[in-house]
Amino acid sequence: MSTGNGAVITQVKKYMFNSTLKRMSVLAEIKDSQGTSLRVLIKGAPEVLKTYMKTTPKNYDETYLGYVKNGARVLAMAYKSVSKMNKADQLAYPREEAESDLIFAGFVIAECPLKDDTNAVMTELKEASHEVKMITGDNALTAAFIG
C-alpha cells in the first residue's frame, strides 16, 4: 500500500482479530525517503488497548466513553517501532511482544445511526408483553444507548 507521502507499507505478519482479545495487529515494513523501518500497527477495543500502551492521554477514558454513550462504535489505534530483524525473526515475532509498550495514535469513531422506527418498534414490542433481548458484540454502553 502506498501513502500520500510516497511511503510504501507492506504487511509482514498479521495477528488475527480475536473476539476474546478484542484486538488485531500487524507487523508492517515501511519504506519511505528515510529508509526502511518496522512497526507494529494495532486496533482494538479502547478499554483493552489501554492496558498495552506505555501512556495514554489524560482524557482517554472520558473521550471514548463519551462517544460510546452516544451510540458510536469506537476503536483505539496504536503503534510501536520495532528493531530491524531478518524475515525468519519477523515471522516468528511473538504477539505478546508485538502488542506491548504501544504508543497511542488515536480513536476511530464510527456512527451507525438507528433506523428511524427502531425506538417505536422496541416500545411496541415491550408494550405487547414481549421480552426483548439484544445480542451484540458492541460495547455495553453502546447497546444501552439503543435501549
Describe the function of each predicted region.
Residues M1-F104, A110, N119, T123-A128, ...:
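Cytosolic catalytic regions of ATP/NTP-dependent phosphoryl-transfer enzymes
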